[in-house]
Amino acid sequence: MPYAHITGWGKCIPPASISNDEISKIVDTTDEWITSRTGIKSRRVSHVSTAELATVAAKHAIACAGIDAKDIDLVILATCTPSTMVANTASLVQKNIGAVGAAAMDTNAACSGFLYALQAATAQIQAGMIKKAVVIAAERMTWYVNWSRRDSAVLFGDGAGAVVLEAADTPAGLLATKTGCDSTDRDILHIENFGSDLNKYEPIGPSNLLFEGREIFKRAVKGMSEACDDVLAQANLSLDDINVLVPHQANLRIIQAIQHRLKVPDEKVMVNIGQYGNTSAATIAIALCEAVEQGLIKPHSNIMSAAFGAGLTWAASYIKWGERVTPISVSDAQLPPCDKTGLELVAPAVKACKEAEPT
């Protein structure tokens, strides 16, 4: 059976940001309130589409792998903020990167999306159906934000990350995984005012990202920790064998609680939520790239990753890194210049959200 090695990695971080102090100009909050409850200090706001974020991240990953985009067999995009529903956003990314003829599909498992997509692409390689895939997670979560609601306005950001998978004979890549969904209480985390169930001929107003924070905290910590235990058992490993933990970056308190429950020391945990906020499916993809860039991931590292999202979806994965931690080549792909600040980018949405609030 072939294995699916990660041979390339890349990210796309929008240049415009909104700090906690700037958020306090929009909703009633403070830097101390946000930081103490979430660990977030800043978040990015994209001036371009989800497809453009995904394209730049994918181009960096492809260059890093040193392959020709025309040799890619599958483009899979994890997102809950697609640029278009029909046709899917992955098809536009496929066109943009020049992966001529490659299969292209979107997948939506909310914050668990990247690990779901990684599993799907890995399975196709292991089955001998394809040889090369690019797996992308890209989100414009600020598009969903109701800027009159403090609870969600402070949490989310935009960004994208990607990896290239290639068939190989030696054991590396995604070697064990556990995915699932507890739909019993799916309504504790959802977006209202969005989807084809709505009557589009009636005024809809801003979308609302609704969640029960305390309940989600408990379920996220329990679900991700238990999934990690299951994956370790699958792989016949102990926590001492794990070199790096790359958790979903939803909330620093959740990360610390999982870390405590699994007894993983600080130096083994990748954390970047402070500068990006929660980018949903993209958090793990971006964190994985930065863990390599920062030297946290080394050749042959054993990596554990876990996520929890709306649905309520969850996933945990054991990834064995390969030999290489440096790019074969570098892409010059970049976003077009942004001539606005983060606050200026969201100003029209802020105005609309506040006007829609009941008086």
UniProtKB/Swiss-Prot annotation:
Gene Ontology biological process terms, A to Z: fatty acid biosynthetic process
Pathway membership: Lipid metabolism; fatty acid biosynthesis
Enzyme class: transferase
Keywords, comma-separated and alphabetical: Acyltransferase, Cytoplasm, Fatty acid biosynthesis, Fatty acid metabolism, Lipid biosynthesis, Lipid metabolism, Multifunctional enzyme, Transferase
Region (ACP-binding): 249-253
Subunit field text: Homodimer.
Function: Catalyzes the condensation reaction of fatty acid synthesis by the addition to an acyl acceptor of two carbons from malonyl-ACP. Catalyzes the first condensation reaction which initiates fatty acid synthesis and may therefore play a role in governing the total rate of fatty acid production. Possesses both acetoacetyl-ACP synthase and acetyl transacylase activities. Its substrate specificity determines the biosynthesis of branched-chain and/or straight-chain of fatty acids.
Protein name (Swiss-Prot/TrEMBL): Beta-ketoacyl-[acyl-carrier-protein] synthase III
Lineage of producing organism: Bacteria, Pseudomonadati, Pseudomonadota, Gammaproteobacteria, Alteromonadales
